[in-house]
Amino acid sequence: MVLYGLKSCDSCRKALKALPQATFVDLRAQGVPGAVLQAALDRFGAALVNTRSTTWRGLGAEERARPPLDLIAAHPALMKRPLIEEAGALYLGWGPETRAALGLA
């Protein structure tokens, strides 16, 4: 199990605490492999970009119009977190649906 996130993200910290066996990958330091990021975009679409973040609010209209993968490559904090990869399946966020799917409900 791999958890992609940020050390400073509350949701990521909660997920790591509940999933001590997960390998943590820092989005800023290491990034997300291109194939995983593309699979996440295919699975979650526009929801992959966190439009409620301060990073998003600081972007101009021209920058916001860029493709999601380009935006995330330029601004890793724009990706909704955590992104969890488990046995080929991807989960986004740390809501009740993700916890239930991982058997933690």
Across the structure, where does each feature detected by a protein language model lie?
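Thiol/selenol-based redox catalytic cores and closely related redox-interacting motifs
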Residues: 27-105
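Local sequence-structure signature of Cys/Sec-based thiol-disulfide redox active-site neighborhoods
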Residues: 1-30
